[in-house]
Swiss-Prot record:
Keywords: Acetylation, Cell membrane, Chaperone, Cytoplasm, Cytoplasmic vesicle, Lipoprotein, Membrane, Palmitate, Phosphoprotein
Upper classification of the organism: Eukaryota, Metazoa, Chordata, Craniata, Vertebrata
Alphabetical list of CDD domains matching this protein: DnaJ
UniProt protein name: DnaJ homolog subfamily C member 5
Phosphotyrosine found at: Y17
Assembly description: Homodimer. Interacts with the chaperone complex consisting of HSC70 and SGTA. Interacts with ZDHHC13 (via ANK repeats). Interacts with ZDHHC17 (via ANK repeats). Interacts with HSC70. Interacts with SYT1, SYT5 and SYT7, and with SYT9, forming a complex with SNAP25.
Length: 198
């Protein structure tokens, strides 16, 4: 069995119909009738001494499972067993995308764009490295502060000095408790009175 050639994936989408003895435009009722007839004929309980019948029964079950599922049947009719393999690997919703991206014109477009942008170096320089490592970076508008780099050591020193300054002044006021009726804007002043004390 190990020396047998692995079955290749078809793109025509007809072999499952041949397993059930049907043509490609068969209805779901035709598929059910043919499946029942062939399943009874090749069932392993009716053919205990015939291992070929068990293999044939597995093929019939597989064909029935695929052809009765509307989504899988549609994929099989369009792309064959290769489409079913792609659906299993990438999901049924991504089959069309896979075949579009693996078409000759999509590959040609990818190669053309690669040649046009010097193997995508222009895209890499402009997007990843901010136009030549920041040398061609657009200037910040007037009035806005420019960002600058702060080293981790300077940041640590700033945090420590803030902690020392905060340690010198004690906290003397408790924060106000918040409820569902607490105002979130600074315009309105909170009221600490209940309805009975108006």
């Amino acid at each position: 069995m190990a020396d047998q050639r692995q079955r290749s994936l078809s793109t025509s989408g007809e072999s499952l119909y041949h397993v059930l003895g049907l043509d490609k435009n068969a209805t779901s009722d035709d598929i059910k009738k043919s499946y029942r007839k062939l399943a009874l004929k090749y069932h392993p309980d009716k053919n205990p001494d015939n291992p070929e019948a068990a293999d044939k029964f597995k093929e019939i079950n597989n064909a029935h499972a695929i052809l009765t599922d509307a989504t899988k049947r549609n994929i099989y009719d369009k792309y064959g067993s290769l489409g079913l393999y792609v659906a299993e690997q990438f999901g049924e919703e991504n089959v069309n995308t896979y075949f579009v991206l693996s078409s000759w014109w999509a590959k040609a477009l990818f190669i053309f764009c690669g040649l046009l942008t010097c193997c995508y170096c222009c895209c890499c320089l402009c997007c990843c490295f901010n136009c030549c490592c920041g040398k061609c970076k657009p200037k910040a508008p007037e009035g806005e502060e420019t960002e600058f780099y702060v080293s981790p050591e300077d940041l640590e020193a700033q945090l420590q000095s803030d902690e020392r300054e905060a340690a010198d002044t004690p906290i003397v006021i408790q924060p106000a408790s918040a409820t569902e009726t607490t105002q979130l804007t600074a315009d309105s002043h909170p009221s600490y009175h209940t309805d009975g004390f108006n």
